[in-house]
């Protein structure tokens, strides 16, 4: 959080790379202080709403839960297809702050509704690469079938860039497979696209 604060103080856009998704709560801390409200745009296979995982409150499985410890943070998640029973009560209790576009409902996603949800908001984008379908992104610690494909992912990011103010981003959970460079290039291009769309439509 101290590094992102220094970057913000210089009025530079912070793009942070994990490592684990557990970096995100620290990454957003300076934005929580700067803005009255922050909308976390979250791409992932997992909800990451556990209170703790193996006794660790700041686990990758608790990343979004820790972000929601900040009372001015709301979450819109895309691609979720794995959630534990322990996360369900918290999700139900906080349904006013958490909106999930479930992977199983992809054909019914209402992206016009999403556009309205983020309109003119300050958005922080966090992308766990296991949100992508395992057929195009097996190079991650917990790959899952049934996820996001390339073009639909870019479409969501582009809608966000056009209709909100993306203030920062992180991309995480790449676990390279020796000899298979295409997955590394995919993540590099994802970062390039996030930055390109953000600055193409950047609001002052």
Where are these regions (language model features)?
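Conserved alpha-helical scaffold segments that buttress catalytic/binding sites
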Residues: 1-204
């Amino acid at each position: 959080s101290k590094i992102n604060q220094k970057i913000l103080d210089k009025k530079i856009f912070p793009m942070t790379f994990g490592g684990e998704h557990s970096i995100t709560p620290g990454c957003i801390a300076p934005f929580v202080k700067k803005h009255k409200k922050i909308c976390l745009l979250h791409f992932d296979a997992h909800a990451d709403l556990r209170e703790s995982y193996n006794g660790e409150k700041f686990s990758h499985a608790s990343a979004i839960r820790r972000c929601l410890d900040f009372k001015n943070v709301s979450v819109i998640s895309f691609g979720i297809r794995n959630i534990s029973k322990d996360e369900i009560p918290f999700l139900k209790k906080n349904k006013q702050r958490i909106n999930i576009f479930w992977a199983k409902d992809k054909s019914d996603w209402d992206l016009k509704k999403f556009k309205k949800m983020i309109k003119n908001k300050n958005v922080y984008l966090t992308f766990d690469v296991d949100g992508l379908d395992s057929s195009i992104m097996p190079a991650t610690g917990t790959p899952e079938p049934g996820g996001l494909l390339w073009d639909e992912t870019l479409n969501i990011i582009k809608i966000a860039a056009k209709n909100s103010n993306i203030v920062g981003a992180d991309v995480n959970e790449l676990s390279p497979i020796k000899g298979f460079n295409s997955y590394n290039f995919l993540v590099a291009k994802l970062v390039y696209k996030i930055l390109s769309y953000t600055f193409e439509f950047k609001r002052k």
